[in-house]
Regions:
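Chalcogenol-based redox active-site neighborhoods
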Residues: 1-172, 179-191
């Protein structure tokens, strides 16, 4: 596992479009969330210990913020051929195991990950109602083995600010986790 930080996409960036299949094969796009007050996009996978570590907290965050008109979408861009634990079939199992109530999408070509300049799992992006990036960073300070409870404190603070019509803090700590498992020859040029 290569420990990789987020590239910290510039704040104010417009949400790149996507049209990807969910675990039932339904195509989900950015436009499907047009009426939401905020959109959280999480690049994630099934096997990374950093994602596994926060999955309960991520599932709880979805339960807590869905009633507040917040949408969450998970996107798996890992190479499923070389990492079969991240295959679409295993993603469907992960949705059930983790209790995710949000769409979990498969980015087979890895083009969407590149549009977002995603680097790691988890890599978290929060967009306001105008779909401008207002937060990109860690879920919270908890990491596997550091003894800090998983709370989602950093992302929750950013969500609460957006929902209250306030600015998010400019001090944002990069997310860190396993690198996205790029297909051979498809590695991005932004590293």
């Amino acid at each position: 596992m290569a420990l990789t930080p987020s590239t910290m996409l510039p704040l104010g960036t417009n949400a790149p479009d996507f049209k990807l299949p969910d675990t039932d094969g339904k195509i989900v796009s950015l436009a499907d969330f047009k009426d939401k007050a905020a959109l959280v996009v999480v690049f994630m996978c099934n096997h990374c210990p950093y994602v596994v570590h926060i999955r309960g907290g991520l599932a709880q965050l979805a339960y807590d913020y869905s009633p507040k008109n917040v949408a969450i979408v998970g996107i798996n861009s890992n190479d499923a051929k070389n990492y079969p634990a991240d295959s679409p079939a295993k993603m469907k199992d992960e949705v059930k195991t983790a209790g995710y109530i949000f769409p979990y999408l498969y980015d087979e070509t890895q083009a969407v990950a590149k549009k977002y300049r995603a680097a790691c799992t988890p890599d978290i992006f929060l967009f306001d109602c105008g779909r401008r990036l207002v937060y990109r960073g860690q879920f919270d300070a908890s990491r596997p083995g550091n003894g800090i409870p998983v709370t989602g404190k950093d992302l929750r603070a950013a969500l609460d600010a957006v929902l209250a019509g306030k600015s998010t803090s400019e001090f944002q700590v990069a997310s860190i986790g396993c690198n996205i498992k790029w297909k051979t020859g498809n590695e991005p040029d932004y590293f």
